[in-house]
Every structure is written in C-alpha cells, then in structure tokens.
UniProtKB/Swiss-Prot annotation:
(6R)-5,10-methylene-5,6,7,8-tetrahydrofolate binds at residues 219, 313. Its main location: cytoplasm. Its EC number is 2.1.1.45. It is an enzyme of class 2 (transferase). This is Thymidylate synthase.
Length: 314
C-alpha cells in the first residue's frame, strides 16, 4: 500500500532521533494521517506478509472483552506473549534464569536467546495447561477488550461501549458521538501496556460507514500493519451488522516511530513493489459481530511478498 510506504519514507527522511521506554531508540514524528478507501480492497500489506489469522483472532479477542492471552495461545497467536511473560518473570513465583531486559538481550546474545526461548515455551505451556496459572499470569489488566465491553463507572456499573455504539449507528447514524475509547486513566497503571490505539470514531454518510482511529503510539514496522488490518476488519464487521457499505478507514497517529533496530527491514520493504489488494470474505453464518469465529473470516487473492522478521520492543 502506497500510503504506508509513504509513511515509512517520511519518517526515515524527516523523523527525529528519540529515546524511548524500551531502551531501543526510535526515529519519530508527531502527527501523521493515512486514508484507505475500503471499496478499493482490503488494506493489508502486500510488500510483506502479514499473518491475517492473527489479526482476526486478536480482534475477536477484543470483541469478546477478553484480556487473558490463553485464548490467543489456543489460536496459535503469540503477539501478546512478551507482556504477560514480563509480568511473570518479575513476580516472586518465577524461579528461572534472570530475564531482565529479555527482549534486548535476546537480540544481542545468542546464548541468552536460547535460554529465553526455553523459558517462554515453558510459560506458554503452563498458560495452556494450567487454568489457575493462566488466570494469574495470562492476564494483561483492563486493556482493550475490557474497556470496549465493560468500562467501569464511578457508580460501580459497567458500560458496553461497543454494543452501545452499534445500537447508536442503527438508531442515530448522524450522531457525532459514535466513539469508543480504550484510554481509561484510572486503569492505566494496572495495564500490561497502556492502549496504543486509544480511541476510534465512526461516521455514516451516503450509506457508507467510515472509521477514524487515533493511535497515540504507532510502531510503524511491526504494529501499524496489524492496526490497519484490524480496524479495517472491525469496520467491515460493524457495517455488515448495521446494513451499511464500507467507506474509509482513516488512521491518525500521534507519535509515529520506527525503532532503530527495524531500519534495515524498513529499507528492504521500501525496495519492494505493492501488489493488488485482496478481498475480505465474511461468512453469512454469524448472527452478530460477537458471534464470529476465526474460521468465519478470510481473504481472497492475498499474494504478498515474503515476511520480514524484526524484533519486538517490550
């Protein structure tokens, strides 16, 4: 997708070198927007393979209001493992090798990488096989799914923002309050990772549903391709439920950054030529957005270039 490649080029050429929480360092810019016409195809990277089924299972995990990585692991989805693992290795229950700064150390020390990978495999196995352990150490706090589906009020009640949003689109499509927020200041200290994609808004015009995402922190190489595909998929699912066509996905970013250890991968991606976008295929079986399963969602005509691996910063 040209819009995404333009973002990578812009940050490489105009970004500012900054330190960051992870210790990796970034090239960063503040304030950037991309627009995708969802009528022109499903916006997923074609200059590198994005594992679409992982996008699907993560979004369904959000839609279920789930915040435990066990569901993800049951669907062979490892994208949230490091944050749960970090909580575990910092606890008194962890008795293995020192895992301080495991992400950076695994990248730089092959011997430690083997130890880390072995500990991670043991952790994943325990999450899958031991429900008590999973309940304690698979939890990531009140992240996206919890805020979307069960926002706690000061009166002790809960708000299902997503269900309310869908109902409002049906009954008052011209509303300017078609918003879901994952940014709950009270819960931030207890989240494994505060919401990067923190707020989204829908807009109805000419029989089409459009979505704008505000993302406070955008990991351009690893995170943003998932975010684009995830919110495009969410727009399609909601449009199906409310009887509208899809319009645009508008992606607005605050701190948009390239990690310093992703620069060579970015240059490799920029050397590739985009291909035709695939088509999203949804099963007719699910009655509502909350009834979808991974097998109900697929892409037709997705023929990307090979994946480009890069380390994740935790």
């Amino acid at each position: 997708m040209k819009q995404y490649l333009d973002l990578e080029k812009y940050v490489l050429e105009n970004g500012t070198q900054k330190g960051d929480r992870t210790g990796t360092g970034t090239i960063s810019t503040f304030g950037y927007q991309m627009r995708f016409d969802l009528q022109e195809g499903f916006p997923i990277m074609t200059t590198k393979r994005v594992p679409f089924k992982l996008v699907v299972s993560e979004l369904l995990w959000f839609l279920h209001g789930d915040t435990n990585i066990r569901y993800l692991l049951q669907h062979n989805n490892n994208i949230w493992n490091e944050w749960a693992f970090e909580r575990f290795v910092k606890s008194a229950d962890y008795k293995g090798e020192d895992m301080t700064d495991f992400g950076l150390r695994a990248e730089r020390d092959p011997a430690f990488k083997e130890v880390y990978q072995a500990e991670m495999e043991k952790f994943k196995t325990r999450i899958l096989e031991d429900e008590t352990f999973a309940n304690k150490y698979g939890e990531l706090g009140n992240i996206y799914g919890k805020q979307w589906r069960e926002w706690k009020t000061s009166q002790g009640e809960t708000i299902d923002q997503l269900a309310d949003l869908i109902e409002m689109i049906k009954t008052n499509p011209n509303s300017r309050r078609l918003i879901v927020s994952a940014w709950n200041p009270e819960d931030i200290p207890n989240m494994a990772l505060p919401p990067c994609h923190s707020l989204f808004q829908f807009y109805v015009a000419d029989g089409k549903l459009s979505c704008q995402l505000y993302q406070r922190s955008a990991d351009i190489f690893l995170g943003v391709p998932f975010n684009i595909a995830s919110y495009a998929l969410l727009t399609h699912l909601i449009a199906r439920e409310v009887g509208l066509d899809v319009g645009e996905f508008i992606h607005t970013m605050g701190d948009a950054h390239l990690y310093n250890n992703h620069i060579e991968q970015v240059k490799e991606q920029l050397s590739r030529t985009p291909h035709a976008l695939p088509k999203l295929v949804l099963s007719d079986k699910p009655a509502t957005i909350f009834d979808f399963e991974v097998a109900d969602i697929s892409l037709d005509g997705y023929n990307p270039d090979p994946a480009i691996k890069a380390p994740i910063s935790v």
